[in-house]
């Protein structure tokens, strides 16, 4: 080994720099290779022999692809979390059912999501108890329906076994009016109302003021109101204004009507009533209005707020009408009825029946028959001279000086 070192020592000054240079160049090449490999685009090398244009990298397409892949991964993670939470909720319901608690046998995806949104365990139990009672009522109705059908079949079978006397007359001079013919006739009336009828607006901008149960109650009243209007002799042209697509109202209406929603003879729009009609022709009906309705005006557009208020949020619709500078009126309940208990907010179906009766007859006594009897004790009869004196005294400050009942106002029941 010593001999080899001695032999190579004269050549050291030539070999060592060459070795250092090779090592340094190798390190530089490795650094350059890492730098180039970390960059996605590479410099195009122009070839004189090739006639094709250089290949360019589409940065926008690459960014879109990367973002979409990230979003898909995020959506998959969120969907996995939702599925896990849904499975855990189903297991919890099954465990409570095995423990003998009141939980429904069948639950939909929407009800399951509503259950997951409950904040506390007691709220979940209350909601499951509500669904259980609803399911039991549905089962009881189905059982009654089956029992009635069985009784009808039994009666029909018994009549078929009885000997016929030949005295039964089955031919009549009047044709039978089938349900399909009735629906066609009512449909023609609805078409005429949409073309020439007086508009009646239901304001659907109150979904944020109600709980889910109150909103479902409101939609039930809307369905009943639409039915009463469709069966009337001279129906209104109903507008559902401020109805957001895929909103709470819209989802519940589509759920209730199903395929018939697109066939309804009414106008559903996201626009506000002030965008469709002039403000001077609009009257907002609210129980909190200081202006009392005297007569039904056929040239006005009446608005009814689609709002079920169980928390007694007084002044909500009146405040909205004032913000939009709309005229407001309330029904003359104190003028014709001896009010007993409860507030003066009526349901939507009661309001439309009152307005339909006023539109057709103009008689307040006939129209106010649709006010529930539990809220008043009877009608008031006011003579003409007392009405004139009352109108004069109302303009003065001496009205409060009269005792109650001094204007010859007496109550009578029908």
Curated annotation (Swiss-Prot):
Q: Which residues carry this modification: Phosphoserine?
A: 79
Keyword Transferase assigned to the entry: answer is yes
Q: Which Pfam families match?
A: tRNA_m1G_MT
> Which segment is the transit peptide?
1-35
Task: List the coiled-coil residues.
Answer: 133-162
List its EC numbers: 2.1.1.-, 2.1.1.218, 2.1.1.221
Which reactions fall under this protein's catalytic activity?
adenosine(9) in tRNA + S-adenosyl-L-methionine = N(1)-methyladenosine(9) in tRNA + S-adenosyl-L-homocysteine + H(+); guanosine(9) in tRNA + S-adenosyl-L-methionine = N(1)-methylguanosine(9) in tRNA + S-adenosyl-L-homocysteine + H(+); an adenosine in mRNA + S-adenosyl-L-methionine = an N(1)-methyladenosine in mRNA + S-adenosyl-L-homocysteine + H(+)
InterPro entries noted in UniProt: MT_TRM10-typ (IPR028564), MT_TRM10-typ_sf (IPR038459), Trm10_C_MTase_dom (IPR025812), tRNA_m1G_MeTrfase_euk (IPR007356), tRNA_MeTrfase_TRMD/TRM10 (IPR016009)
Primary location: mitochondrion
For this record, the Gene Ontology CC terms, alphabetical, are: mitochondrial nucleoid; mitochondrial ribonuclease P complex; mitochondrion; nucleoplasm; nucleus; tRNA methyltransferase complex
Keywords noted in UniProt = Coiled coil, Methyltransferase, Mitochondrion, Mitochondrion nucleoid, Phosphoprotein, S-adenosyl-L-methionine, Transferase, Transit peptide, tRNA processing
Q: Which superkingdom?
A: Eukaryota
One biological process term from GO is: positive regulation of mitochondrial translation
In this chain the SAM-dependent MTase TRM10-type domain maps to: 186-378
Q: Which PROSITE patterns would you find in this protein's record?
A: SAM_MT_TRM10
Q: Which GO terms describe its molecular function?
A: identical protein binding; tRNA (adenine(9)-N1)-methyltransferase activity; tRNA (guanosine(9)-N1)-methyltransferase activity; tRNA binding
Q: Where in the cell is it found?
A: Mitochondrion matrix, Mitochondrion nucleoid
* Known partners and oligomeric status: Component of mitochondrial ribonuclease P, a complex composed of TRMT10C/MRPP1, HSD17B10/MRPP2 and PRORP/MRPP3. Interacts with HSD17B10/MRPP2; forming the MRPP1-MRPP2 subcomplex of the mitochondrial ribonuclease P complex. Interacts with GRSF1.
The family note in this entry says:
Belongs to the class IV-like SAM-binding methyltransferase superfamily. TRM10 family.
The protein's job, in short, is: Mitochondrial tRNA N(1)-methyltransferase involved in mitochondrial tRNA maturation. Component of mitochondrial ribonuclease P, a complex composed of TRMT10C/MRPP1, HSD17B10/MRPP2 and PRORP/MRPP3, which cleaves tRNA molecules in their 5'-ends. Together with HSD17B10/MRPP2, forms a subcomplex of the mitochondrial ribonuclease P, named MRPP1-MRPP2 subcomplex, which displays functions that are independent of the ribonuclease P activity.
Name of the protein in its database record = tRNA methyltransferase 10 homolog C
Q: Which gene encodes it?
A: Trmt10c
């Amino acid at each position: 080994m010593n001999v080899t070192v001695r032999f190579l020592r004269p050549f050291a000054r030539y070999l060592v720099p060459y070795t250092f240079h090779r090592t340094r160049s190798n390190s530089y090449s490795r650094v350059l290779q890492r730098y180039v490999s970390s960059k996605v685009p590479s410099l195009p090398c122009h070839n004189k022999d090739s006639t094709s244009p250089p290949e360019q990298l589409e940065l926008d397409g690459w960014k879109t692809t990367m973002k979409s892949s990230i979003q898909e991964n995020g959506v998959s993670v969120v969907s996995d979390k939702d599925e896990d939470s849904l499975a855990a909720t189903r297991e919890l319901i099954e465990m409570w059912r095995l423990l003998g608690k009141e939980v429904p046998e069948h639950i939909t995806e929407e009800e399951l999501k509503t259950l997951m949104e409950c904040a506390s365990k007691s709220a979940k139990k209350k909601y499951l108890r509500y669904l259980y009672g609803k399911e039991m009522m549905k089962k009881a109705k189905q059982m009654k329906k089956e029992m009635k059908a069985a009784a009808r079949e039994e009666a029909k079978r018994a009549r078929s076994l009885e000997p016929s006397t030949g005295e039964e007359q089955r031919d009549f001079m009047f044709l039978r009016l089938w349900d399909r013919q009735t629906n066609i006739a009512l449909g023609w009336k609805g078409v005429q109302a949409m073309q020439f009828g007086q508009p009646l607006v239901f304001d659907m901008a109150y979904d944020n003021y109600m709980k889910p149960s109150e909103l479902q109650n409101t939609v039930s009243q809307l369905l009943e109101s639409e039915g009463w209007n469709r069966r009337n002799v001279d129906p209104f042209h109903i507008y559902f204004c401020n109805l957001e697509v895929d909103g709470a109202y819209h989802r519940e209406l589509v759920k209730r009507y199903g395929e018939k929603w697109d066939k309804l003879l009414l106008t559903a729009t996201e626009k506000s009533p002030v965008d469709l009609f002039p403000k001077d022709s609009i009257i907002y009906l609210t129980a909190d209005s200081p202006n009392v309705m005297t007569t039904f005006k056929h040239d006005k557009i009446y608005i009814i707020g689609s709002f079920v208020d169980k928390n007694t949020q007084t002044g909500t619709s009146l405040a909205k009408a004032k913000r939009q500078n709309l005229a407001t009126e309330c029904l003359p309940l104190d003028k014709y009825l001896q009010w007993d208990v409860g507030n003066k907010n009526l349901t939507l179906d009661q309001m439309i029946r009152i307005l339909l009766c006023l539109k057709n007859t103009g008689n307040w006594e006939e129209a106010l028959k649709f006010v529930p009897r539990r809220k008043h004790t009877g009608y008031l009869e006011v003579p003409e001279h007392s009405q004139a004196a009352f109108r004069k005294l109302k303009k003065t400050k001496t009205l409060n000086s009269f005792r109650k009942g001094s204007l010859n106002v007496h109550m009578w029941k029908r």
